[in-house]
Amino acid sequence: TYSGNPIACAAALGTLDTYKEEGLLTRGEELAPYWEDALHSLKGEPNVIDIRNIGLIGAIELAPIPGSPTKRAFSAFVKAFERGALIRTTGDIIALSPPLIITKGQINE
């Protein structure tokens, strides 16, 4: 089994050390309001039904295309991928969770 594997535990501890040394969790807290404002600025855009978030995790619900559920979100996925961004879709919802090292400039993009 992989439970309690010493190598995996060492990697996890190293990751936690990096989070602490680089202040990544604090950085996430500091960027959360900026992220929220940027995300919610999309309200009123065509086909946007709802926007929700907590911290640096967000979701944009899109109006489904009649007779083609999930197509609108999948099209957004493809366009984002072509531009170098990775998003996740569930139905007609786009899920976003940027890395903790994201900059305000990158959020603006």
Question: Where does each model-flagged region fall?
Answer:
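Conserved N-terminal phosphate-binding loop of PLP-dependent enzymes in the Aspartate aminotransferase
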Residues: 1-109
